């Protein structure tokens, strides 16, 4: 008898933070006098394809993870086209691959890239991660699929730093992500700030 496949859905809000002319955004306090504006950013991560609504064999997880939010940056900064709207596809994963707490499976790389930033603006770029109603210090996106959802399974985002440092998605300023080293300024601009990550399934308990 074939079992009903479990569902996996999580919501992730992403926003960078900065201060503009005394105005405070998202509780952050960064130095600088230039005004900032929002750029919309949306990513979609699917476990298997078929429009993200799939009927998988027994012992497999299915569903989708929606990444959405905004990047707040100075007027000189722009978001690379391929970072604005994207689908990050996670492969089908068998239950045996997530059999115990702390186990991860199916890591998929993705990045968020800015362009045309001057040196000062690039150094101020920060990303603040928040996933739905995640609690303080939580380092995975909770499953919001509803009835029939996979239990104890979420989505983890880690840095592409060679170590796989988990990103905390509680939306606190202390856990915001600073732009990596952007290189030397060239003709008023810098090498594109690029935030690199991996998204994967996580058995959290």
From Swiss-Prot:
Any matching Pfam family: Fimbrial
Keyword Cell membrane: yes
Principal location listed in the UniProt entry: membrane
Location(s), subcellular: Cell membrane; Fimbrium
GO biological process assignments: cell adhesion involved in single-species biofilm formation
CC terms in the record's Gene Ontology section: pilus; plasma membrane
Protein name, entry field: Minor fimbrial subunit HifD
UniProt keyword terms in alphabetical order: Cell membrane, Fimbrium, Lipoprotein, Membrane, Palmitate, Signal
Signal sequence, renumbered to the chain: 1-19
UniProt function note: May be a minor structural protein required for pilus biogenesis.
Covalently lipidated residues, kind N-palmitoyl cysteine: 20
Membrane topology category: Lipid-anchor
Protein source organism: Haemophilus influenzae
S-diacylglycerol cysteine lipid modification positions: 20
Entry similarity comment: Belongs to the fimbrial protein family.
């Amino acid at each position: 008898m074939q079992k009903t496949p479990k569902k996996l859905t999580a919501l992730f809000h992403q926003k960078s933070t900065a201060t503009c002319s005394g105005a405070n955004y998202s509780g952050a306090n960064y130095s600088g006098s230039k005004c900032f504006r929002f750029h919309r950013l949306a990513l979609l991560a699917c476990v298997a394809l078929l429009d993200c609504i799939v009927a998988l064999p027994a012992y497999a997880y299915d569903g989708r993870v929606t990444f959405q939010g905004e990047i707040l940056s100075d007027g000189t900064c722009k978001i690379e086209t391929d970072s604005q709207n994207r689908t990050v596809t996670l492969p089908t994963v068998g239950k045996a691959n997530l059999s115990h707490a702390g186990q991860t499976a199916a890591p998929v790389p993705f990045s968020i890239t800015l362009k045309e930033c001057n040196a000062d603006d690039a150094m101020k770029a920060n990303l603040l991660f928040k996933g739905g109603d995640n609690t303080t210090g939580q380092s995975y996106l909770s499953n919001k699929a509803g009835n029939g959802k996979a239990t104890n399974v979420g989505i983890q985002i880690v840095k592409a730093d060679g170590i796989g440092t988990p990103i905390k998605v509680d939306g606190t300023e202390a856990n915001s992500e600073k732009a990596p080293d952007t290189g030397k300024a060239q003709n008023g601009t810098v090498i594109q700030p690029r935030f690199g990550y991996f998204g994967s399934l996580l058995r959290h308990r």
